[in-house]
Design a protein with these regions (language model features):
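A short, well-structured beta->alpha microelement
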Residues: 70-88
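Cytosolic transmitter module of two-component histidine kinases
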Residues: 51-57
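FMN-binding flavodoxin-like domain, especially the glycine-rich phosphate-binding loop
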Residues: 1-46, 56, 68-72, 91-94, ...
Length: 195
């Protein structure tokens, strides 16, 4: 058996070159060990990107993250928090929350329902979920990134496990977003087995 990159795989020349070398190493190891088991390269890690936004910044970052994860071979889904019922949350494998904070520490309008449901006594255990939160805010406000901090705290309290630590972003969020999304790619790709 020999692993190879399909001709229609969406990689740049440099990525293709690196992957070919990587797969050549795996192929030579398989041949040397005489291992006849089929090799499986995982593809399509399911990821739900839930966004809460008052002005559109968190939504734009969610769509940007969708593209990045798709290019990396994962299976992302972008969801407005208003369209993500609490009853569906325990079935999510990887949950990425991108949310702003509105006013004086309030969740954005479209995140309010999920926020309140997660903080209710009826909130389900979420031990099967891996998650991370990107919190957008303005350090000029006393309750800087409060909504994102609250989501992070509540998901952890309900048993969800962090993929990467929470990242808080001030008005200039491009660099923190980039670092967070790069860490996520690595963390999700390294997950091989369900919880």
């Amino acid at each position: 058996m020999s692993l190879r990159i399909p001709d229609n795989a969406p990689f740049t020349g440099a990525q293709r070159y690196w992957l070919k070398g990587y797969l050549d190493g795996i192929n030579s190891s398989l041949q040397a060990s005489g291992d006849e088991e089929p090799a499986v390269i995982e593809r399509g890690h399911p990821v739900t990107i839930a966004w809460g936004s008052q002005t559109g910044n968190a939504e734009a970052l969610a769509k940007k993250l969708f593209k990045k994860l798709s290019k990396a071979g994962m299976s992302p889904k972008v969801s407005d928090m208003a369209d993500l019922p609490l009853v569906d949350l325990p079935t999510v494998e990887n949950l990425l929350v991108i949310t702003s904070t509105y006013g004086e520490g309030e969740p954005p309008d479209n995140a309010r329902s999920l926020y309140q449901a997660l903080h209710s006594e009826d909130a389900p255990e979420l031990g099967g979920i891996r998650y991370s939160v990107l919190a957008l805010g303005d350090s000029g406000h006393e309750e800087f990134c409060k909504c994102g901090l609250d989501f992070d705290d509540r998901l952890s309290t309900l048993g969800a496990r962090p993929l990467v630590p929470l990242v808080t972003c001030d008005v200039d969020y491009d660099e923190p977003y980039q670092l967070w999304s790069d860490q996520l790619l690595e963390a999700i790709a390294s997950v091989r087995t369900p919880l």
